[in-house]
Amino acid sequence: HGVASRTKLAAPLDHLPQGELLLRGDSVAFPPDGCAYLHTHQGPGLRCLIEGGIRIDTHGHSTSLGPGGAWFEAGPVPVFAQAASDRQSRFIRVMILPAALLGKSSIQYVNEDDKAKPKTQSYKIFADMPIVRKAP
């Protein structure tokens, strides 16, 4: 009958600039043993693993997550992601990005060598919606 929801994770977004931005909802899938090389994004976002397993390395710490596990990435802080070795893994995320990234990737690799390496992750964008953040 109705849709029930509960908050898994919340993060303040006070530091976002005012003006035109982009709200993106997408998913990222990895084959067994896939990884996302050390990278940053051009904006913050919440993630939730919906299949498989993943280890997130950031801020000098490693966190292993199973289905339902949620985490926040600030954007400019480098992150390395290692998917489970024995099964496909997938997470969904919502990010706030610069408006200029409409339809474009937000990932930026930290190490020059990683830019040319084959990437194992695949993306599916569900929503790319321009939004405006007004002054409080």
What are these regions (language model features)?
Residues 1-21, 66, 104-136:
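A short, N-terminal "cap"/entry segment at the start of jelly-roll beta-barrel domains
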Residues 1-6, 74-104:
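Ligand-binding loop in jelly-roll beta-barrel domains
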Residues 3-36, 94, 98:
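A short glycine-rich, His/Asp/Glu-containing loop-to-beta-strand
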Residues 25-27, 46, 70-72, 93-94:
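Conserved hydrophobic/aromatic beta-strand scaffold that supports enzyme active sites
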Residues 30, 58-79:
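Short acidic-glycine-tyrosine-enriched beta hairpin
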Residues 33-45:
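A short beta-loop-beta micro-motif enriched in histidine and acidic residues
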Residues 42-61:
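Glycine- and acidic-residue-biased ligand/ion/polar-headgroup-sensing regions
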